[in-house]
């Protein structure tokens, strides 16, 4: 049995849960999320918490037990508090701006890089170089942050590029002049 899967998921006040077979719908102050469980997992609500039960005994079901418990917990946290990732843009002339549902970035290329912001995600720009990505779906927030970072991964010589806030880039020494 999974140690993580056995743990109950505490429901904060104000979260509405509806369970229909293997479909779980969570609704909170930030929004609404839907999660579908595999056939071998059952969920029920008890004493202000959600409890998952594994009805199968296969190796795969044991692995999926902990995974789906974590995914449900992330959904509960998402509709209650939401998730955010912060990115920083380093480089001379590098900047970003939000125009409607598009993020426009000047990253030293001959053209601006335009990224279509997905539904359910909000991007805020401070000081033209600091991005904050917010949403209720943890997986989608992380994927959007990784997509944006992928446009110009920080390089080790000058440190130019898009990086996560607090990320440390290992710097390399450049070429030394030969005599």
Curated annotation (Swiss-Prot):
Similarity comment: Belongs to the universal ribosomal protein uL6 family.
Keywords linked to the UniProt accession: Ribonucleoprotein, Ribosomal protein, RNA-binding, rRNA-binding
Gene name in the database record: rplF
Organism: Methylacidiphilum infernorum (isolate V4) (Methylokorus infernorum (strain V4))
Any one annotated GO CC term: cytosolic large ribosomal subunit
Alphabetized PROSITE patterns for the sequence: RIBOSOMAL_L6_1
A GO MF term: structural constituent of ribosome
A biological process from GO: cytoplasmic translation
Function: This protein binds to the 23S rRNA, and is important in its secondary structure. It is located near the subunit interface in the base of the L7/L12 stalk, and near the tRNA binding site of the peptidyltransferase center.
Subunit: Part of the 50S ribosomal subunit.
Top-level lineage group: Bacteria
Protein's name in the database: Large ribosomal subunit protein uL6
Record has rRNA-binding as a keyword: yes
Family matches, as InterPro entries: Ribosomal_uL6-like, Ribosomal_uL6-like_a/b-dom_sf, Ribosomal_uL6_a/b-dom, Ribosomal_uL6_bac-type, Ribosomal_uL6_CS
């Amino acid at each position: 049995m999974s140690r993580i899967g056995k743990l109950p998921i505490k429901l904060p006040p104000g979260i509405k849960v509806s369970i229909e077979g293997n479909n779980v719908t969570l609704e909170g102050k930030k929004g609404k999320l839907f999660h579908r469980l595999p056939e071998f997992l059952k969920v029920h609500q008890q004493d202000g918490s959600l409890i998952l039960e594994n009805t199968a005994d296969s190796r795969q079901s044991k692995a999926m037990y902990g995974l789906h418990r974590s995914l449900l917990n992330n959904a509960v946290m998402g509709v209650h508090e939401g998730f955010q990732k912060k990115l920083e843009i380093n480089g001379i002339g590098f900047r970003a701006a939000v125009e409607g549902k598009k993020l426009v970035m000047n990253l030293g290329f001959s053209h601006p890089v335009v990224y279509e912001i997905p539904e359910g995600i909000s991007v805020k720009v401070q000081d033209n170089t600091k991005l904050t990505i917010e949403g209720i779906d943890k997986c989608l927030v992380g994927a959007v942050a990784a997509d944006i970072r992928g446009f110009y991964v920080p390089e080790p010589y000058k440190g130019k590029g898009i990086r996560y806030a607090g990320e440390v880039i290992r710097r390399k020494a450049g070429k030394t002049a030969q005599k």
